[in-house]
A protein has these predicted regions:
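N-terminal Rossmann-like NAD(P) cofactor-binding module of classical short-chain dehydrogenase/reductase
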Residues: 65-67
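Intrinsically disordered, low-complexity and often Lys/Arg-enriched segments
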Residues: 1-3, 110, 203, 235
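SAM cofactor-binding core of SAM-dependent methyltransferases
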Residues: 2-55
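Short, well-ordered alpha-helices that flank and scaffold nucleotide-derived cofactor binding pockets
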Residues: 16-20, 41, 97-100, 136, ...
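Anion (oxyanion) recognition and catalysis
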Residues: 19, 139, 213
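Class I S-adenosyl-L-methionine
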Residues: 55-63, 75-198, 203
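Short glycine-/small-residue-rich Rossmann-like dinucleotide-binding loops
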Residues: 71
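C-terminal target-recognition/interaction regions appended to catalytic cores
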Residues: 148-151, 198-235
Length: 235
């Protein structure tokens, strides 16, 4: 069975989504006692780990998927916009520390996927450099800014560590009567056999760009950016 760990768990949204799709939550991290009491009632078998800053990824049960909806206050346009340097939104780095500790302990086997959710302000905070920092922290590689200077609402980058894809989703199209847009990012790590299987090779991406140029065709900006990155970075 596919297993899941939930960081910044709140009232257990990730866990609820997991059980509805045949995934078993093993553990969660939430520092606020009230929401933790709610998840304790609805998911009594889930191990509650508490404060994320005190968790060692090498010492907790390995899981296939780690989810993290890290605090958005420092990224949101409604806040002071301290970005990832802020005390709350900067907790994202603890999530990635836990991921790396677990992968090192399991020789790269777990987690297989990392899922991150946050506000659209992550695209623009700190002169648009915070989302670049998120991608680089997950991919452990230098990720260039888009040619337009703006992050697309959907995109993909790859590194030797993993393949990363993101997309903006709006709650109103998912059964909730409100307009609420959020970034959802999924990283698939090397070693599980999926990233290379379902992605174009470096040579293929370079060929698409070359033929488009030869024929005078203009590719959509997002597609051209993704192809250019893959043609440059490869595996």
């Amino acid at each position: 069975m596919i297993t899941l760990g939930s960081l910044f768990d709140g009232i257990g949204g990730w866990q609820l989504a997991a059980v509805k799709n045949g995934v078993k939550p093993l553990w969660s991290s939430e520092i606020d006692p009230f929401p933790a009491s709610i998840t304790g009632k609805h998911f009594p078998d889930t191990i509650q780990l508490g404060d994320i800053t005190k968790i060692n990824g090498a010492e907790i049960p390995p899981v296939d998927i780690i989810c993290a909806g890290s605090p958005c206050q420092d990224l949101s346009i409604a806040g002071r916009r301290e970005g990832l340097d802020g005390k709350r939104s900067g907790l994202f780095y603890h999530a990635m520390r836990i991921v790396r500790e677990m992968r090192e302990k399991t020789n790269g086997k777990y987690p297989r996927f990392f899922v991150w959710e946050n506000v659209l302000g992550a695209f623009t905070s700190n002169a648009r450099r915070d989302f670049k920092a998120v991608l680089e922290e997950i991919g452990q590689a230098d990720i260039p800014m888009p040619a337009s200077g703006r992050w697309a609402r959907a995109g993909m980058v790859r590194s030797k560590e993993c393949g990363i894809a993101w997309r903006v989703l709006d709650a109103q199209f998912w059964g909730v009567p409100q307009h609420r847009e959020r970034i959802f990012l999924v990283a698939g790590f090397r070693g599980w056999g999926g990233t290379s299987r379902y992605s174009l090779t470096q040579k293929a991406c370079a060929g698409i760009l070359r033929r488009a140029k030869e024929r005078g065709k203009c590719l959509p900006e997002m597609l051209e950016t993704v192809l250019a990155r893959q043609a440059h970075n490869g595996d």
